[in-house]
Structures are given as structure tokens and as C-alpha cells.
């Protein structure tokens, strides 16, 4: 197979043109590998941190223009993020042309146009309690996501830099529902938890936590800083995309996903076209079809212009 093409899984007759924007028949009879054009990509999904957001946690003018141009051309633009709904509020107006959020690493699907939750998956109560008990013995900030909202201890939110999350200080001050003792609150009045983040004070603490909980039936991802992201078993950005594509009646091979980190790996592997940011982890670049510029040089705009809209 020529570089730039990959076989469409389960098919002998079609390839994905990873350097263009469609699915093509092999055209064996006339010797034309590209063959007959079959369909265009209809949906593009962006991770937030490290992808559509630059190092200053803002969206550049060029990237925003590309998002809006894609929407005007009738393409679906979505977010594929570990963030919850409340953590995305500050971007709601600027990203008005984003139709859906696959948020909380796939545990919650949100209709941004109608501002409604379409689907969610929650962690079993006994698993949440086991994780809380384990975390109680370490210097770790427990950060829960429930019904699209964030909850954490007020004392820890006041010093996020201690947990290597200082870049999010202003956001957490603004959006987190703060309590004195989140573990005690949960045990007294259990509430649905879609996702549970553990922000550790050091990488060693994260390793100890991981060794103690890795046997639990959870989806566990290493994330930025010294954090762990815990989701319901078999829930990921990939499962979220599958659910949303079913809801929107868009085949997976007509999707483009852009990402940079470990929690993007599974969804990148199932997308029609996987795009790694220039700042992506080396193994993420290896598994992707193409690599674009980094998040400080409008890699997302490049993905839109080169692979979604270019004929």
C-alpha cells in the first residue's frame, strides 16, 4: 500500500487516503490505486489541553477561524476532552460552532447546542469508596466529576501548584464546587461520579497509587503533571466517539481526531484519520496517520485546512 494510505478495517476494497480527505475504492481494474472517490470526512474532534488550546490555555485566532470555517462548510466539529462541562464554560461563546462535547474522557456526552446531557456512564459506588480510602493515605487531591460539574476540597483547590496543576488555578477557583472533606461528603450522601481524577504531589505518589488501584475494574489513564484519571471500565474517548457517531449517524471512517496525549490513544486508533500534534508524545505520533504543527503554531488549523476541507 502506498504511503499515505491505510486499509479500511474489515474491507478488501477500500482504503483511506490519509493525505487527503476521503475513502476510495482501490480501482484495481484500471490500475488506479486512488480509484473512485467514495466519501468525505464529516466530523473532526479536537482534544483540548495540548491540542486546540495553546500553552497559554487560549485558542488562537487562526485556529478559531478554521473551526468556524469547517462549521460553515457543514462539517461537525466536536471536542474530545478529559474536562467536564463546567471546565468548558469559558469557551462556550468562542466555540459556538462546536456542536458536541465528548467530555470526561468519554464518560459524558453533551449537546452543546441544546445544552443537554445525552449520555453518561458512572463509577460503581464501591469502587469510588475504595479509591477514596487509598487516596486518604497519600498527598493527593481528589477531584470528582458529577453530572458535568467538578468537586474537590477547598483547601487543596487553593494550592493547585502543589499538585502540579497550577496552570489550572484560575479555572479551578472559578468552576470547582468546593467542600471541606469530599470523601466524607461522598460517604454520607453518595452521588453519581462519572470520572475521578487523582492529582498527586509527586510522580512517586502517583506510581504508588497506581500500583494499589491498577487491579480494580477501572479505566485508568496517566495524565499531565502527576495525575491519574479514573473512568468506568471500558469507557474512554474512543467509546464516547462511537456513541456519538451512532447518535449522529456518522460512520467512524468519516471522522478525524486530533490529539497529543495518552488519553487520546484509543480514540486516535479508531478514527478514520488520526492526527498527532507536533507536541504530542513520541508514541502518539507513531500510532497516528499524520503529524501537524504543535499547539503553539496552529496545528489544529492545519488539520482542518489540509485534511477536512481540502478537496
Residue ranges of model-derived segments:
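Residue-level signal for inorganic ion chemistry
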Residues: 70, 81, 105, 196, ...
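Short active-site oxyanion
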Residues: 74-78, 97-99, 194-196, 253-254, ...
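Short, acidic loop-to-helix structural element flanking the phosphoryl-transfer center
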Residues: 57-73, 120-127, 179-181, 234-246, ...
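Short, Lys/Arg-enriched N-terminal segments with co-localized hydrophobic residues
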Residues: 17-37
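Conserved acidic, metal-coordinating active-site core of Asp-based
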Residues: 134, 138-141, 145-258
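Asp-based phosphoryl-transfer active-site loop
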Residues: 42-55
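Mg2+-dependent phosphoryl-transfer enzymes with acidic/Ser/Thr/Gly-rich catalytic loops
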Residues: 39-43, 60, 228-311
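Active-site phosphate-binding/coordination module
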Residues: 61-165
Amino acid at each position: 500500500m502506498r504511503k499515505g494510505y491505510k486499509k479500511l478495517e474489515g474491507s478488501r476494497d477500500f482504503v483511506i487516503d490519509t493525505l487527503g480527505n476521503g475513502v476510495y475504492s482501490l480501482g484495481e481494474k484500471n490500475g488506479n490505486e486512488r480509484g473512485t472517490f467514495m466519501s468525505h470526512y464529516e466530523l473532526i474532534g479536537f482534544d483540548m489541553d495540548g491540542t486546540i488550546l495553546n500553552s497559554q490555555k487560549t485558542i488562537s485566532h487562526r485556529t478559531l477561524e478554521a473551526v468556524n470555517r469547517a462549521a460553515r462548510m457543514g462539517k461537525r466539529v466536536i471536542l474530545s476532552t478529559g474536562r467536564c462541562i463546567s471546565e468548558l464554560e469559558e469557551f462556550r461563546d468562542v466555540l459556538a460552532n462546536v456542536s458536541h462535547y465528548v467530555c470526561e474522557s468519554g464518560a459524558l456526552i453533551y449537546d452543546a447546542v441544546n445544552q443537554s446531557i445525552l449520555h453518561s456512564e458512572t463509577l460503581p459506588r464501591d469502587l469510588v469508596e475504595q479509591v477514596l480510602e487509598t487516596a486518604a493515605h497519600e498527598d493527593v487531591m481528589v477531584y470528582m466529576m458529577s453530572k458535568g460539574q467538578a468537586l474537590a476540597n477547598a483547601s487543596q483547590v487553593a494550592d493547585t501548584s502543589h499538585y502540579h496543576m497550577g496552570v489550572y488555578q484560575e479555572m479551578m477557583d472559578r468552576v470547582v464546587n468546593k467542600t471541606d472533606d469530599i470523601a466524607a461528603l461522598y460517604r454520607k450522601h453518595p452521588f453519581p461520579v462519572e470520572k475521578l481524577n487523582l492529582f498527586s504531589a509527586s510522580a512517586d505518589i502517583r506510581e504508588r497509587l497506581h500500583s494499589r488501584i491498577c487491579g480494580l475494574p477501572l479505566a485508568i489513564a496517566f495524565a499531565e503533571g502527576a495525575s491519574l484519571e479514573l473512568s468506568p471500565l471500558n469507557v474512554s474517548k474512543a467509546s464516547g466517539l462511537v456513541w456519538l457517531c451512532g447518535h449522529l449517524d456518522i460512520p467512524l471512517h468519516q471522522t478525524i481526531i486530533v490529539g497529543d496525549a495518552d488519553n487520546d490513544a484509543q480514540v486516535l486508533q479508531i478514527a478514520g484519520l488520526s492526527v498527532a500534534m507536533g507536541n504530542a508524545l513520541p508514541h502518539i505520533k507513531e500510532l497516528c496517520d499524520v503529524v501537524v504543527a504543535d499547539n503553539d503554531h496552529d496545528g489544529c488549523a492545519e488539520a482542518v485546512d489540509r485534511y477536512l476541507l481540502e478537496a
